[in-house]
Amino acid sequence: KFNMLKIGIQWFLNKSGPCSTSFLEAGGFAKSSPEREYPNIQFHFFPSFVIDHGLVEPDRHGYQLHASPNHPKSRGSVTLNTSNPYNYPNILFNYLENKDDLKQTIEAIEVARDILGQNSMKPFAGKETGPGSDIQTPELYEDYIRSKAETAYHPSCTLKMGNDDMAVVDEKLKVYGIENLRVVDASVMPEITSGNLNAPTLMIAERASEFIL
């Protein structure tokens, strides 16, 4: 805790130190394999060693390239837990339910390895810590991914906009069958966007304000 206070003071006084960086210094999009129609994976580059979203203090220095599918095909659900609207709902994320998500994730790891294996990165290279150079077969990849993969905080599409039987809101973001109720967040997206959800969600909110005002 003392170290965190010192880091905060350093940033407040000098605008320097660990708090002066976003910790995500670079990113990008790529195809996980040549037959993909469009870039289907997203990268986040950390010039640091991050474990469990930063909740675990690392015991070494390093850098990481996180890779994930842009459009996972697995589908979860959000359902009512009780009739009390103040109780928490049942949330089933259902990660990796679709086999193609696992295939894309394996391909993403291989692309990340190729990027970090370039000559320009060799002066900074060290031992691969995850998944580890010994992880090479589909079975080992799957074991690693199922045990170590983490969410990237992009839940969406649970109250989709549309005009089919699964749609919850219309083109004005109004909930079907209920008056004076709109939903304005990432849940109304029919499909997840290609990349982070913050900017598209702000756009949805801006549009909703126009509908309301």
Residue ranges and their predicted role:
Residues 16, 100, 132-133:
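A general boundary/transition motif marking the beginning of the first structured unit of a protein
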Residues 33, 63-121, 140-213:
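C-terminal structured subdomain/cap of oxidoreductase catalytic cores
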Residues 30, 64, 128, 132-134, ...:
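Compositionally biased, intrinsically disordered low-complexity regions
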Residues 1-59, 114-119, 136-139, 144-147, ...:
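Mid-to-C-terminal "cap/lid" subdomains and adjacent gly/pro-rich loops that border
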Residues 123-136, 213:
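Active-site-proximal substrate-binding core of FAD-dependent oxidoreductases
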Residues 50, 128, 165:
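Residue-level detector of flexible, active-site-proximal loop/helix-junction positions
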Residues 44, 108, 125:
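Mobile, glycine/GP-rich and aromatic-enriched active-site lid/loop segments adjacent to catalytic centers
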